[in-house]
Amino acid sequence: MSINVLSSFLALVGDIAGELPKGHAERSDQLVRAAESVVRNIAEGAGWWSEADSTKHYKIARGEAMECAASLDVMKLRRLVATETYENGIQLLESLVAMLTKMI
């Protein structure tokens, strides 16, 4: 797992959350929670001895990453995030999902 991809995505999420217009706190919270859940599930998966337990948490992390992508899609459609920011986020998520898929 590349920590650079994960940390870059978390930094981007922080930027997006800080820049969303007033009235979109729910969208911000949902994206932040899903992104942080990716990190927590990867950490929890790494802490288990059995492959089955680890895999379960990596699958959850992958699902949370997909939720982040869906959140970015909605924000882009609603014109709440710049195209460049959206594309950067999707690119990071594609890398993250690919890495998690290999771990499953």
Name each model-derived stretch:
Residues 1-104:
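Amphipathic alpha-helical assembly/interaction segments
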